[in-house]
A protein has these predicted regions:
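Acidic-enriched and Gly/Ser
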Residues: 1-121, 147-181
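Short linear motifs in intrinsically disordered
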Residues: 111-114, 135-140
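Short, conserved beta-turn/loop elements at beta-strand boundaries and strand-helix junctions
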Residues: 127-129, 139-144
């Protein structure tokens, strides 16, 4: 089962390292922080940076919750495990599949996507955002990011991912443009 631990923003990497050092591998299969790629320009050149996909959250994979919770009591800086007020709730299969689809099973890195804007519609031509155009709430072309609105952790969350718009056309003739790519 996949669980999500809430931590103070900025301490994610420290908490992940603590968990890996202190919790037995038989209890905690994996502890990770998903990242996304974003293009950023500095010193006159474009660079690809990696940023935390869900600031303030660390993901845990464990089969048995009770020994995991007992061990997490010794992790300094953990706020809580996501769930309802009474119980801890693992991520749903749909949430897990979305994370795997976007970031891969092992590396958990959402790679940069490329898209075209035709009129008032965006079409993703490559990358993990393909087929997810309906979830895009906002595009910041200057920062080269898309903000997605997704149901995660039992609520609707905004998720930033890297998106480079390689072309913008005012007309609505998308077929000709998409056939060229």
């Amino acid at each position: 089962m996949w669980y999500v631990m809430q931590v103070r923003t900025g301490t994610e990497e420290n908490i992940r390292c603590q968990c890996q050092r202190t919790i037995d591998r038989r209890i905690l299969e994996r502890c990770f922080i998903p990242y996304y790629q974003q293009k950023k320009r500095f010193q006159g050149q474009w660079h690809i940076q990696e940023r935390i996909l869900f600031p303030g959250y660390v993901f845990l994979i464990a089969e048995n919750l009770e020994p995991l919770m007992e061990n997490l009591k010794h992790v300094i800086g953990m706020t809580r495990i996501i769930g309802t007020e009474e119980t801890i709730v693992p991520l749903t299969d749909q949430e897990v599949n979305l994370l795997i689809r976007m970031g891969g099973d092992k590396e958990q890195l959402v790679r940069l996507s490329q898209g075209i804007i035709q009129g008032d519609q965006v079409h993703i031509i490559s990358g993990p955002l393909q087929g997810m155009e309906g979830a895009i709430r906002k595009i910041d072309r200057h920062k080269r990011i898309a903000v997605l609105s997704l149901d995660m952790f039992g609520r609707t969350v905004d998720m930033k991912v890297g998106l480079e718009i390689i072309e913008k056309n005012k007309d609505r003739n998308t077929e000709a443009c998409l056939q060229e790519t």
